[in-house]
Amino acid sequence: GAEDDLLKRASLLRRDSVHGVFKGTIRVDEERQSFIANGNEVKVIYADAPEDIDYTQYGIQAGIVVDNTGVWRDKAGLSRHLAAKGVAKVILTAPGKGDIKNIVAGINEDAIEETDTVISAASCTTNAIVPVLKAADDEYGITTGHVETVHAYTNDQNLIDNYHKAERRGRSAPLNMVLTETGAAKAVAKVLPQLEGKLTGNAIRVPTPNVSMAILNLTLKQGTTREALNEFMREIALHSSMKKQIDYSDSPEVVSSDFVGSRAA
């Protein structure tokens, strides 16, 4: 890394444009190539390839690598981490391709087996909508549905107009609402197989830095009313096994920034 790499990384943790100032102390230890956040050492390791790292040098045995690079989404690519000494498992923070299990916390973590070495934690959209879809399908049955995501812009987009391999995403993220695709409908089926082929989806990237929204338009097998559905979702949010994933609000005054830092999906 560059000479001031550690200082810059520590500074990014210390001050965040969305979440504010880090609550605690951060100290850089250049000798150990790490920084210490509230007494917890964060080691920064540099390598040209994942298999080149020897994690055992840092006291790590049977470690879990969390891959959020976006470079690989298939088992062959992600398994390169497993070739490194000291690594036992790999978790991908995006929808996995091929036969990688997509796991949404609170929904299908029971599908994880001891022999699984590479799994996916699915996408942010999948984690947001799957708990609600499961609750609705269990109670009413879902015939068909459409998912419309209104998504905060991401680092994949451009600050100003520039080339991008995807349609429209080359246009300035802070200045435009950008129509784009989402793989959420297909990703849902990897977690809830009973909904395969029943959902469609698309997305709009909007000029906000955090908090996204998913609008579900569902055709239910069993009829209900808006009041009954809202009360059902409220009960799910308060008393079900998915209460950590689903939060409920019926306030007509809330806006997106009110949900910054929410621990719900």
Predicted regions and their residues:
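C-terminal substrate-binding/catalytic lobe of Rossmann-fold NAD(P)-dependent oxidoreductases
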Residues: 1-55, 144, 149-265
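A short, aliphatic-rich alpha-helical micro-motif
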Residues: 57-59
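Conserved acidic residues
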Residues: 61-63, 88
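Rossmann-fold NAD(P)-binding glycine/threonine-rich loop
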Residues: 69-117
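Active-site phosphate/pyrophosphate- and oxyanion-stabilizing loops and adjacent acidic/basic residues
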Residues: 79, 134, 186-189
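Short, solvent-exposed amphipathic alpha-helical segments in soluble enzyme
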Residues: 82-84, 135-138, 232-237
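Rossmann-like dinucleotide-binding core of oxidoreductases
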Residues: 96-171
